[in-house]
């Protein structure tokens, strides 16, 4: 069972959320262009993980337009962000200080170039950064080759789908891999999935699935037998259905699980996260929906075993589990932290102000007031910040926002 530790109100709509691979840190990108990093409480001496305060490590106006996507590097020391201002910036996770940046490749010709807004960023390895854009391009950047900030060019560019890339899931490295890093990944976009190789480019495109594919996750450790290898790709669609794809059989789906049975056709499944094995019964995925609910689906029996509500109106944009097994859900103007329930006590509500935090204060230290910035190039451009509502919100059915920031205690009946 899980309860909310707290609900953290945000100053503007959440566009992207990233969870640190080894530390209790969460970073977010907002529609206002701000990027903010939080430090979650460490386990207390009495063993109650997750109780305490969530501190702002740093907060800054990183992009002049909306911050579309954020993502940590493989080792967690670097936080990448990309915005509608056409810039990708790499900052130190601990301080927020920008170390280098480069321009998103533009589209058009000599008669007129325009920004191709980013929609997804992912560090595949210490050497390779993947960046997807609204035009459907998927760029590969070599992080070892840092040319001047304006002239940086991708090593490769692919167009795996007719539409923009809605999700990206790396495939596990092969048994013969010497680096230990993935060299292939699966993307969803439009009504298809595609498999791309670091060296050979696009390998496979699936058949048209007849519905928009939005989210994905890769699950290992399933029961093998017959043609099943015990590994499946889980894909979330716009009509409330999860599809399962057998490893290596990427041309068409293998199984279907109806997650949302709404009378109007089902809510779209915006984001998928694998529940840590120690928290679930068997293999379980958490699915964030456009109506603000999170549903938990057990693979094998292929059924929904529990659900909770992140928000009554706004959809779930970010979902994942931190290094201590706490679930982090984000959407609308709130981020919520959930821990495995120990008692019926409510978590403490963090009413921290939405102030700017100057870098260099260290993890977990909060400075109130001031207008410090961790990026010398940052300035205000409120007119640009409001132009990018459509991409993230186009599948949302609810309107309005939950401004209360109150604590909501929910239980997972199937996960205790």
Swiss-Prot record:
Phylogenetic lineage: Eukaryota, Fungi, Dikarya, Ascomycota, Pezizomycotina
A cellular component annotation (GO) from this entry: nucleolus
SUPFAM superfamilies, alphabetized: WD40 repeat-like
UniProt keyword list: Nucleus, Repeat, WD repeat
Residue numbers spanned by region Disordered: 149-183, 343-416
Gene3D superfamilies the record matches: YVTN repeat-like/Quinoprotein amine dehydrogenase
Subcellular location as annotated: Nucleus, Nucleolus
Ranges occupied by WD repeats: 9-48, 62-101, 112-151, 214-255, 264-308, 309-348
The protein's name in its UniProt record: WD repeat-containing protein JIP5
Location, primary (coarse class): nucleus
